[in-house]
Regions:
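Charge-rich, intrinsically disordered regulatory segments
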Residues: 1-114, 121-124, 128, 466-483
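Flexible, glycine- and charge-enriched loops at secondary-structure boundaries
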Residues: 3, 153-160, 203-206, 311-318, ...
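Hydrophobic, well-ordered secondary-structure elements that form the walls
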Residues: 30, 366, 412
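Intrinsically disordered, low-complexity acidic/Ser/Thr-rich segments used as protein-protein interaction/activation
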Residues: 78-128, 132-295, 337-353, 381-390, ...
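C-terminal transactivation domains of fungal Zn(2)-Cys(6)
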Residues: 147-150, 273-379
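Residue position in alpha-helical solenoids
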Residues: 170, 216-219, 328, 369, ...
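Structural helix-adjacent loops and short alpha-helical linkers that scaffold large soluble proteins
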Residues: 202, 374-382, 419-428
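C-terminal region signature
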Residues: 404-409, 421-484
Length: 484
C-alpha cells in the first residue's frame, strides 16, 4: 500500500487508500482486478496561488449578503463534510453559505420563499453532485458580480472555470443516464442562472439550459414520477417552475417559444390539479404578481410573433388583450387580490406585494401599447402608465433581498425603454442601481448598459418622441437581455 493517496482517483482506489492512475473509464488497478470503477465529483484544490484573471470591477459595488438571522428562521448551517464523507473545503463551504444566505435570498420576494428554497435545495444538493456543482458555480458567479476576486485565497475565476468544466460534464453524464427527475430540472435552471449572473454576452448559453428544461418536461410521460416525495423539494420546485416560466415569458426573449406541452405538464407536475387548469388571480408569493398576468404577457409575445404580417388580426387580438388587462386592473382596484404564500404577511409586505403586482400590470399595458399598437414613448397611454409605475415605485421598499424589489427587472427596464427626458432617465438609473446592489448579478448591469445605449441611439437619430421601439434597437445592438 502506498502512502500517496490520489485526490482525483476512483472510488475503489480511494477506499483502499492507494494511488490511482486516474485512467478513464477504468483505472489500471480496477482493470487488473476486474472491479467496477467509478469516479465521483471531488471537491479538491491545488495549493498553488492562482493569479487574478482580469475581473471586471468598474461597475461593481461590493455589498455583503444579508445576515441569515434577518430572514426569520435562518437556513440550515452548511456541514463540514458531504454525506459520502468527503470533507468540504473551506472555499466551497463559503460558496455554499453565500448560495444559501445570498443568492437564494436575492431570488426571494419574501423570507418564507427564501426558507422554502433553502430547505428544498440545500439538503438535496449534498447528495447530488450535478446539482451541487451548478449551485457552487452560481454562487461563484454571484461573488464575481459583486466585485470579489478571491474566496479563501483562491481565484474565483479559477473556481468558476473548474466548476463549469467538471459540473457540466456531470450534467451531461446524468442526461445520458436518462435521469428526468426534479433534481435534473433544478440543475438545468441553476446552470441557466449561473450564466445569467455571470453576465456573459455573445453566445447566450442560458438559453440552451432553458431549452434543456423544456426538453426534459416535454419528454416526460404523464404517468412517470418526476418528484421524489420530498415535500421540501416539491415546495422549492413550485417556485423554480414559476421562475422557469417567467424566464421564458418576460419580454426581450423573442427567440424562445414559451408555449407547448412543457408549461402545461410542468403546471401539472409541480402544482395541484385545480391550479393546473385555471390560473389564479391571486398574487403569487414567488413571482410578486399573478400567474394570470404572466399568461397575458405570454399571449402578447405570441401575438407579436405570429401576427406580425397580418395587421388586422393583430389589431383584433390587441383589443381583446387590452380588454383583459383593463378588466384585471379594474377588478383588483375594487378588491385587492390575496397573496398566495405560506406565511402571514406584515402590513409592509402586503403593501409591497400589491404594489409590485400593480406595477407589473402597468408594465404589461406598456408592452401591449408598444408591441401591438406601435405607440411611441411620448404617447399619452404609455406616459400615463409610466407615471403610474413611477409613483408606485416611490412607495415600495427598495433595494433589499427577500422582498418584492427582487422582481422589478422587467418593469424597470420597460419604463427605462420609454424614458425620453433627463429626469425619467435619472430616476430609472437610480432604481436599476438599487436592483443591481440587491440581486448581485451582472445581468442587471447589462440592463443598465443597454438602456444607456438605447437612449444614445435615439438621441443620435433625433428620435425625441421615442418612435423607435427599444426591441429593434436591442436586436441591432446584439444584447442578450434577460428579465426576472
Amino acid at each position: 500500500m502506498t502512502n500517496h493517496r490520489s485526490r482525483r482517483g476512483c472510488e475503489e482506489c480511494r477506499r483502499r487508500r492507494r494511488k490511482c492512475d486516474e485512467l478513464k473509464p477504468t483505472c489500471g488497478h480496477c482493470n487488473a482486478a476486474n472491479r467496477s470503477c467509478r469516479y465521483e465529483l471531488r471537491l479538491v484544490w491545488s495549493d498553488r496561488k492562482v493569479q487574478h484573471r482580469g475581473l471586471r470591477t468598474t461597475h461593481c459595488r461590493l455589498v455583503q449578503p444579508p445576515p441569515l438571522d434577518s430572514v426569520g428562521q435562518s437556513p440550515a448551517p452548511i456541514p463540514d463534510s458531504l454525506p459520502n464523507g468527503v470533507i468540504l473545503p473551506r472555499r466551497y463551504k463559503k460558496l455554499l453559505e453565500y448560495f444559501s444566505g445570498g443568492v437564494l435570498a436575492s431570488l426571494s420576494s419574501h423570507p418564507s420563499i427564501h426558507q422554502d428554497l433553502c430547505r428544498g435545495l440545500i439538503p438535496k444538493m449534498l447528495y447530488s453532485p450535478h446539482l451541487l456543482s451548478a449551485s457552487l458555480a452560481l454562487s461563484a458567479a454571484g461573488l464575481l458580480s459583486r466585485g470579489l476576486s478571491e474566496v479563501e485565497g483562491t481565484s474565483i475565476s479559477y473556481v468558476l472555470e473548474h466548476l463549469q468544466s467538471s459540473g457540466l460534464s456531470l450534467l451531461r453524464k446524468a442526461l445520458t443516464e436518462q435521469r428526468k427527475d426534479e433534481v435534473m430540472v433544478a440543475t438545468c435552471l441553476i446552470w441557466c442562472l449561473a450564466d445569467v449572473f455571470a453576465g456573459i454576452q455573445g453566445v447566450p448559453s442560458w438559453r440552451i439550459h432553458l431549452q434543456g428544461i423544456k426538453a426534459l418536461l416535454d419528454g416526460h410521460q404523464p404517468d412517470d414520477q418526476l418528484g421524489t416525495g420530498d415535500t421540501a423539494m416539491e415546495s422549492a420546485m413550485r417556485h423554480l417552475f414559476l421562475l422557469y416560466r417567467s424566464l421564458q415569458t418576460l419580454p426581450y426573449l423573442q427567440t424562445i417559444e414559451p408555449s407547448g406541452p412543457s408549461v402545461d405538464l410542468g403546471q401539472t407536475l409541480f402544482f395541484d390539479s385545480s391550479s393546473a387548469l385555471t390560473r389564479s388571480p391571486k398574487i403569487d408569493g414567488f413571482l410578486g404578481y399573478s400567474e394570470e398576468l404572466l399568461d397575458l404577457l405570454q399571449h402578447i409575445n405570441s401575438a407579436t410573433r405570429n401576427n406580425s404580417d397580418h395587421q388586422f388580426s393583430l389589431n383584433a387580438e390587441a383589443d381583446i388583450l387590452l380588454g383583459k388587462i383593463n378588466g384585471m386592473i379594474s377588478r383588483d382596484a375594487k378588491t385587492p387580490p390575496e397573496v398566495s404564500i405560506s406565511s402571514t404577511l406584515s402590513p409592509q409586505y402586503s403593501r409591497d406585494f400589491l404594489l409590485c403586482h400593480q406595477i407589473f400590470q402597468q408594465a404589461t399595458l406598456i408592452q401591449l401599447y408598444r408591441q401591438l399598437y406601435m405607440m411611441p414613448s411620448a404617447s399619452r397611454p404609455i406616459q400615463s402608465a409610466v407615471q403610474a409605475i413611477n409613483g408606485m415605485i416611490q412607495n415600495m421598499t427598495q433595494g433589499q433581498p427577500c422582498n418584492t424589489w427582487v422582481a422589478m427587472a422587467m418593469p424597470l427596464f420597460t419604463v427605462g425603454c420609454e424614458a425620453f427626458d433627463g429626469d425619467q432617465k435619472d430616476f430609472i438609473l437610480d432604481k436599476v442601481q438599487k436592483l443591481e446592489v440587491c440581486i448581485g448579478s451582472l445581468h442587471v448591469h447589462t440592463i443598465k448598459r443597454a438602456l444607456k445605449d438605447v437612449w444614445k441611439i435615439r438621441t443620435d437619430y433625433q428620435d425625441f418622441e421615442g418612435n423607435i421601439c427599444a426591441s429593434q434597437l436591442l436586436e441591432k445592438l446584439q444584447y442578450n437581455i434577460i428579465l426576472f
